């Protein structure tokens, strides 16, 4: 096993490495979105190298990261991350609405996303939701819940990733397919010190009560009776 403890550079962002590897052969380490959030994992490259990734705790691998470079053979081990597409909901329009309308829409949007158990991150007046079902179904959920006035589109996950902090990337892309993960939806109003309204996914449980969650990432294994 080859131990990888440091990232040498990034062939997609660093001009020096772009020039150095211009004619190199890439041995890709292909990771899905969950694997990319781990600072420690073991996986083989496309050419069969047994790689043990052991990075600092808060270091996250990015698409194009160079993990190893052999000048003699002109071969570089490079990370390729396959991210899910993302639905982007634009909340800017809500700034023109009354406070009551803003609160109502944010609550209803959080409830709709929460009932679907879709992960979500809000940033810069947008909501990012990774695709876990067909786009037609996500489109249907938005329209049947009356959110036609909120523009939304579908983009590649790689387009959204640079806008996110490491913790936001872990929340959005780390295990997006887990249906028991709660949704966190914040206010469309950007406050300088993180203040403002925060609306979270709400769940109705078999024991007859419902609840919302504070702003933290956690998983629960329990049965739900959803009310739509």
Swiss-Prot record:
GO molecular function: nickel cation binding; unfolded protein binding
Keyword S-adenosyl-L-methionine: no
UniProt entry tagged with the keyword Cytoplasm: yes
Disulfide bonds: none
InterPro entries: UreE (IPR012406), UreE_N (IPR004029), UreE_N_sf (IPR036118)
Protein task: Involved in urease metallocenter assembly. Binds nickel. Probably functions as a nickel donor during metallocenter assembly.
Protein name, as recorded: Urease accessory protein UreE
Gene: ureE
